[in-house]
Regions:
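Perimembrane helix-loop-helix junctions
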Residues: 12, 199-228, 254
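Transmembrane-helix motifs of polytopic, lipid-linked glycan transferases
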Residues: 27, 107-128, 167
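Extracytosolic helix-loop segments that constitute the early lumenal/periplasmic catalytic or substrate-binding loops
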Residues: 41, 54-79, 86, 244
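Loop-to-helix entry region of an early transmembrane alpha helix in multi-pass inner-membrane enzymes
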Residues: 85, 89, 97-118
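Multi-pass, polyprenyl lipid-linked donor-dependent membrane glycosyltransferases
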Residues: 107-112, 136-143, 147-167, 193-200
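Transmembrane-helix signature of polytopic, membrane-embedded enzymes
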Residues: 118-144, 162-163, 178-181
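Specific aromatic-rich, kink-prone transmembrane helix
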Residues: 160-179, 183-187
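Transmembrane-embedded, aromatic-rich helix segments that form part
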Residues: 181-187, 191, 195-210
Length: 260
């Protein structure tokens, strides 16, 4: 027996229930954002390391500001990090205008976290979520602050790489070839902030190929892999090979903790 199509009254009731639930979720998300936002605001100007990498990350930014090498042999006053230089470059450039310190570094990360949140809302809307429901995803994102290591506002490269990676993920699936190019370029730029995002490239490439075809997949490779390889080549030549040592060889020598 065929199902009876829903009446207009039933549709209205379902729509009301859907929007009521979405607004309730948005209100709860607003409360979470208020709590986490207050904690982040209270930490911005804290005059010391909140996490062990912060001070050393600011030293990298100071060296970038002063035009000193970021990668080389370890010394008594400086040991390079195992990450690409984009965050240090950005904070170092801003340090020509603003005082270099914890507030500047954390503000950059907090701003990047907001940009990442924008990608989350954009992606939810693209998948058909209503505005209240899409905005409520920000509450879920904020709720991960503590369990994620509270890196949203730390002087680290994580928030920057997350923002770039997030927009790469939500732009690449769009129908327009320009969106594919933009997503690929953003993924390449994210690689200059944290090399781990390269792991996203393969599943994204497979998805683009299966959804949009081989030619679009080639376009994604040209806009993501090629710029990333050019970056690696330039940095390797500029540092006499030291960049690759810190980016690949040093992390490869570390023990792996799978629980993390």
């Amino acid at each position: 027996m065929p199902e009876t199509p829903p009446t207009s009254r039933t549709k209205r009731i379902e729509l009301i229930v859907e929007y009521a639930a979405a607004f309730a979720a948005m209100i709860l998300a607003g409360w979470v954002l208020k709590v986490v936002g207050a904690a982040i605001a209270a930490r911005l100007a804290y005059p010391g390391d909140i996490e062990w990498m912060e001070g050393a990350t600011l030293v990298s930014a100071m060296r970038a500001r002063d035009g000193l090498a970021l990668y080389g042999a370890p010394a008594g006053d400086y040991i390079p990090f195992i990450y690409p230089p984009l965050y240090a470059w950005i904070v170092g450039a801003l340090a020509h205008v603003f005082p270099l310190g914890y507030t500047l570094g954390r503000s950059v990360s907090a701003a990047c976290t907001m940009v990442a949140g924008g990608a989350l809302v954009f992606g939810a809307r693209r998948e058909g979520a209503s505005w209240p429901l899409a905005l409520s995803t920000l509450g879920l994102f904020a709720a991960c602050w503590d369990d994620g290591g509270t890196f949203y506002d730390l002087c680290r490269t994580d928030a920057l790489s997350l923002a770039l990676m997030g927009w790469a993920v939500v732009l690449t699936p769009l129908p327009s070839p320009r969106a594919t190019i933009a997503g690929g370029l953003l993924l390449a730029v994210a690689f200059t902030a944290k090399q781990h995002v390269a792991l996203l490239g393969l599943p994204m490439l497979v998805w683009v190929g299966r959804t949009h075809g081989r030619e679009r997949a080639k376009l994604f490779v040209l806009s993501s892999v090629v710029p990333a390889l050019c970056f690696l080549l330039v940095m390797t030549l500029a540092t006499g090979g030291d960049f690759l040592k810190w980016l690949i060889l040093v992390p490869a020598a570390h023990g792996q903790t799978l629980a993390r």
